């Protein structure tokens, strides 16, 4: 039986964390051949390696090392470097998450008519000065399937004219990520280290 070839692209540490549980499922599925690509948008693999190890992820199949001087140069390098990878791998499906510059590699996949799945689709801040707002709109509108976290994100896409059959509400993958780390969280001594009282603090990022 022919396995479905799925390519997942990451480029930043938040993407690695959010996609970690899904990547593990894709890797474990006997019906899927999973190909992992790291664009190196912000950091090279060595500076991201701790996250791959912490979440029990293998080394990516392709390292694009696309980071360069300006954001525009980085985007250009990402598109140039993903192009031959797509030709070599010929994936059946292409998965990206969020609104980083790395997500714009979906443009190359679209040109090659590879089905695009966009997780965290439909998020909007309604501030055109924010570069990520442009990124997420581009990817939302070229994606074949938009995977939203919430009803309001789905509503935003519908208002922008996307058909309902291209939108699926999945919720956030962070629940699965946190559940997979439950034992490690329970063993953590970070509250003692920071002298914090349980349930008497909050985190701002």
Task: Identify the residue ranges that each predicted region occupies.
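Short, well-ordered coil/turn elements that cap or connect secondary structure elements
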Residues: 1, 29-31, 58-59, 111, ...
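N-terminal subdomain of nucleotide-sugar transferases
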Residues: 1-41
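Phosphate-coordination loops involved in phosphoryl transfer and adenosine-cofactor binding
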Residues: 3, 91, 199-200
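Active-site and donor-binding regions of nucleotide-sugar-utilizing enzymes
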Residues: 7-10, 16-25, 51, 63-163
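Structural beta-sheet core signal
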Residues: 8, 36-38, 96, 118, ...
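Conserved nucleotide-sugar phosphate-binding/catalytic loop shared by glycosyltransferases and other
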Residues: 32-74
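A nucleotide-sugar donor-handling region in carbohydrate enzymes
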Residues: 42-46, 142-205
């Amino acid at each position: 039986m022919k396995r479905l070839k799925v390519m997942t692209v990451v480029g930043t540490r938040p993407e690695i964390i959010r996609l970690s549980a899904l990547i593990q499922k894709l890797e474990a599925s006997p019906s899927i051949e999973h190909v992992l690509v790291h664009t190196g948008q912000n950091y090279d693999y060595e500076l991201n390696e701790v996250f791959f190890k912490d979440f029990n992820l293998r080394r990516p199949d392709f390292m694009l090392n696309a980071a360069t001087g300006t954001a525009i140069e980085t985007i250009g390098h990402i598109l140039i470097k993903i192009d031959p990878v797509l030709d070599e791998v010929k994936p059946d499906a292409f998965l990206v998450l969020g609104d980083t510059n790395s997500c714009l590699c979906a443009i190359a996949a679209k040109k090659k008519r590879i089905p695009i799945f966009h997780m965290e689709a439909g998020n909007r801040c309604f501030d055109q000065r924010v570069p990520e707002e442009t990124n997420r709109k581009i990817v939302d509108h070229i994606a074949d399937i938009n995977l939203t976290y919430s009803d309001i994100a789905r509503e935003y896409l519908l208002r922008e004219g996307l058909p309902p059959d291209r939108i699926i509400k999945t919720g956030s993958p962070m629940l699965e990520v946190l559940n997979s780390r439950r034992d490690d969280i329970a063993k953590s001594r970070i509250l003692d280290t920071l002298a914090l009282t349980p349930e008497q603090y909050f985190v701002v990022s």
